């Protein structure tokens, strides 16, 4: 609040403005800001340089060099910390933030090119999308795992939902296993079942996302997942998972939990994927994570000739495209999903 008063905001209004500014920042941004502040202190201690805000050009370049040399982070991560650094300046009242201009941009571009060259030399590739073939392999290998039925159904329910709904991993899963944020975590009260409209009697799983990226500042969005006549049906997978729970799940608890009742996290899901797909994916050369599911359906749709607009709508990559899509009648959307499922499974061109 102090920096706002220094800018000339009346003291009686400063608290209101500060509170509004805080609500305008996502929790992940606050986390990045906190991490950046800690790194500034560590960098200052390691280099013996007084890294005080506001940063000079030399401070910014020192910070970038320290992150690369000492923290061994990639260019993409450095850019994230730079965003946190800008936030640190804003929080201290420096609203006209200029962290180096063209020279810093040139250095960051060079680090990005260096990372790409190193990845190429090491045979590493970009993140793989989860394609239909990978989903088939995941299902087959899950059946062979010496896991409890509940654990298998948990992994498969997450996988089918992530694939069918192009969800971001933490739209479905907890960040940590022992606690959760009810304002962003998918809870039991956020999912419900209904029956299709018109002549369709197929089930619809309604998933309410409280804080999706494509609806910032709005009251969330509902993603409809439709029952399909295939092994990829997310509705059936969810029903089986819920039946396998060994405890009573309250409405205010996370949807996806382990048999011990702990939150199933994105890290845990990634770990399970590596185990189940160990004979399918060359993990030394390929990068497949929980986020790969988000690109999976889009990849299949592109291969079938769907337009960019359709893909952006179904995958929620563009807020205007998706919000236009969800305003269409549910019967029409169900037909779209049925058509997509049929073509994806049969591999026929549109």
Residue ranges of predicted features:
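Extended, non-catalytic subsegments within catalytic or DNA/protein-binding/adaptor domains
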Residues: 1-350
């Amino acid at each position: 609040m102090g920096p706002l008063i220094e800018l000339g905001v009346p003291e009686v209004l400063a608290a209101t403005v500060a509170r509004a500014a805080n609500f305008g920042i996502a929790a992940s941004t606050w986390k990045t800001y906190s991490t950046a502040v800690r790194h500034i202190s560590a960098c200052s201690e390691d280099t013996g340089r007084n890294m005080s805000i506001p940063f000079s050009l030399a401070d910014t370049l020192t910070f970038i060099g320290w992150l690369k040399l000492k923290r061994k982070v990639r260019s993409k991560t450095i850019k994230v910390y730079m965003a946190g650094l800008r936030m640190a300046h804003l929080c201290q009242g420096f609203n006209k933030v200029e962290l180096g201009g063209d020279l810093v941009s040139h250095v960051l571009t060079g680090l990005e090119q260096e990372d790409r060259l190193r990845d190429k030399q090491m045979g590493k590739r970009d993140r793989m999308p989860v394609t239909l073939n990978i989903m088939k392999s995941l299902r087959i290998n899950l059946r062979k795992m010496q896991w409890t039925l509940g654990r298998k159904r948990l992994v498969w329910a997450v996988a089918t939902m992530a694939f069918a709904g192009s969800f971001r991993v933490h739209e479905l899963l907890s960040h940590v296993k022992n606690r959760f944020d009810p304002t962003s975590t998918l809870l039991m009260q956020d999912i419900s079942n209904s029956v299709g409209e018109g002549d369709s009697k197929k089930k619809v799983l309604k998933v309410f996302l409280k804080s999706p990226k494509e609806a910032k500042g709005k009251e969330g969005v509902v993603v409809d997942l439709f029952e399909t006549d295939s092994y990829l049906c997310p509705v059936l997978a969810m029903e089986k998972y819920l039946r396998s729970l060994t405890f009573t799940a309250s409405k205010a608890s996370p949807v996806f939990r382990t048999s011990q009742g702990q939150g199933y996290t994105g890290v845990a899901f990634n770990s399970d994927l590596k185990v189940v797909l160990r004979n399918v994916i060359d993990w030394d050369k390929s990068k497949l994570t929980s986020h790969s599911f988000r690109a999976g359906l889009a990849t299949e749709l592109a291969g079938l000739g769907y337009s960019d607009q359709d893909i952006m709508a179904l995958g929620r990559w563009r807020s205007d495209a998706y919000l236009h899509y969800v305003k269409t009648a549910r019967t029409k959307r169900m037909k779209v999903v049925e058509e997509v499922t049929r073509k994806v499974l049969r591999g026929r061109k549109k």
